[in-house]
């Protein structure tokens, strides 16, 4: 597979994976790809913990599902991320960013305009939306054959210092290498983010994984092989839309947006789902 093809096909997997274990060969390839990422002064600040134990995965899935339910029930999630929610194709076409909630139960569709109001939050809780989403999230994580914890060396990751930026930047490059490699291997990947949204929940995962004091747990991902047909959850979104080049590229200085690049280049095809 060509690199540009993998970049264009890269996506986040919102649905379930096949139950098949990820082969050790593929695990090694993924982590080799991560280790080949660039880093400031070749510091290689990243560390990874590979998780296959069903009990550990089950415990993390419980923490993730409970976190999602809580963050959505109390409104903190919607308040924090409301600039990125889209409920119509027209809005997505205008903004060209965020998440388009294009799959919703019929009972909820009339209330999308109220989702960020107190009444909307009450309605969602009445309909059990946070609980439904939390349980679906738990099942997705629990059904994943492989989790990957991403850590940084605290001797390099020192918040408030320039080394912290370098470390996070390097970690991002390592994770992008993994993400692109999943495309080549017929796999999917998704960030397990909700435990970071609720105070105390991330600490539970840190304890569960026995992360030592000299490392900082930065992220946890779920990975697995993709089924031939991917089933979408009851409430789902798409995020394939991308900003036009003239919206994020400038020429010579920041007063001059790039011109003539808004049309997709030859061979680009349609963007990936996320």
Annotate each PLM feature.
Residues 1-274:
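Acidic, surface-exposed loops and disordered segments
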